[in-house]
A protein has these predicted regions:
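C-terminal-of-GTPase-core extension/linker across diverse P-loop GTPases
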Residues: 1-47, 51-68, 72-83, 88-274
Length: 274
C-alpha cells in the first residue's frame, strides 16, 4: 500500500506496486511540488521505505540491509506515516513498527489505506451495529487507538490509493506535524502544566517518598525534549511517565509528536554547578 499511495501523490507509476508484501526493498525518494488550492505550492520529499520485519524473521542479507535503510529513513524524516490495511486492521507488526518510530523520536500519523473497500463493505450491509458510516469510521478509529495506545494521540487519516479518496489530507497532515514540532513552549507555562499534572495525580509513594519536580525547561525539538530538575530520577516510573506525556501533549496540542523527558537529579545538578 505504501508504494501505491506514493504513486497516487506523485500521479505516476515510478514505484513498483505489487500485491506481494515486501516488494519494496530500497527506500525510494521522490520530490513533490504540490499545488494546493488557494495556498500556493507545497514542497515535499516522499520516501517510500522497505517494510521492516523483526530480526529473527529476516531471511536474507538484502532484507537485512533494507531494514537498516528503512531505519535510517525514519531517523531523517520530519513526519512518518504508518500505513495500515483497512481490511486487516492493526497487526502485531504494525505495533512493532509504531514503537520503533516512536523510539526514534519521529512525529507519526496513521494512514488507513483501502478505506473505499471498508466503505463498500459497510454499505453492502455486511456490518451491523452502526447507525451510519461516520459512526463506523469513529468506531474503527477508536479500535486503532486502543491497539496503539502508547502513541502520542497520532492523527488517523482514512485514504484510498486506488480511488484517490482524501489523498490531499496526507500532505496537509505532514505540514501540520512539521509545523507543530517547531512550537516553542514557554518556561512559565511548562512549569505550571507539569505542576498541575503532579498535583492532579501524585506519583506513587516509594519507601515513604514521591517523585518531585522542582523546575522544567524545554531544551530541544524534533522530538520535544523537556528537562526536569527533580529529586530522584529512579522514582519516575514508566506508567507515570506515560501519564505525564499524555497530559503534556494534550495541553500543548502536540498530536503525533513524541516528548522526551530528560531527568536531572539533585546530586547531578549540584555536581554540575560545582
Amino acid at each position: 500500500g505504501k508504494s501505491s499511495l506514493c504513486n497516487r501523490l506523485l500521479a505516476s507509476d515510478r514505484m513498483i506496486v505489487s500485491d506481494v508484501p515486501g516488494t519494496t526493498r530500497e527506500s525510494v525518494e521522490r520530490d513533490l511540488d504540490y499545488e494546493s488550492k488557494g495556498e500556493g505550492t507545497w514542497g515535499f520529499r516522499l520516501v517510500d521505505t522497505a517494510g521492516m520485519r523483526r530480526k529473527r524473521k529476516v531471511d536474507s542479507t538484502l532484507e537485512y540491509f533494507s531494514n537498516l535503510r528503512t531505519k535510517g529513513a525514519i531517523e531523517s524524516s520530519d513526519a512518518v506515516f504508518l500505513v495500515i490495511d483497512a481490511q486487516d486492521g492493526v497487526t502485531k507488526q504494525d505495533q512493532i513498527l509504531a514503537e520503533s518510530i516512536l523510539d526514534e523520536g519521529r512525529a507519526l500519523a496513521i494512514l488507513v489505506n483501502k478505506w473505499d473497500q471498508a466503505q463498500d463493505t459497510f454499505r453492502g450491509g455486511a456490518l451491523e451495529g452502526y447507525a451510519n458510516l461516520k459512526e463506523f469510521r469513529d468506531s474503527y478509529e477508536e479500535s486503532i487507538r486502543k491497539e496503539l495506545f502508547f502513541l502520542p494521540d497520532s492523527p488517523v487519516v482514512f485514504v484510498s490509493a486506488q480511488t484517490g479518496f482524501a489523498i490531499e489530507r496526507i500532505l496537509r497532515t505532514a505540514r501540520q506535524l512539521d509545523a507543530i514540532q517547531e512550537t516553542p513552549l514557554p518556561t512559565g507555562e511548562l512549569n505550571r502544566v507539569i505542576g498541575g499534572l503532579l498535583e492532579r495525580q501524585p506519583p506513587t509513594l516509594i519507601r515513604g517518598k514521591r517523585f518531585k519536580v522542582y523546575y522544567t525547561v524545554q531544551v530541544g525539538t524534533r522530538p520535544f525534549r523537556i528537562r526536569l530538575f527533580c529529586n530522584q530520577p529512579h522514582r519516575f516510573e514508566k506508567g507515570y511517565k506515560r501519564y505525564m506525556e499524555k497530559g503534556f501533549q494534550s495541553h500543548f496540542g502536540l498530536p503525533g509528536c513524541p516528548v522526551r523527558f530528560l531527568l536531572t537529579g539533585k546530586e547531578e545538578r549540584y555536581s554540575r554547578e560545582d
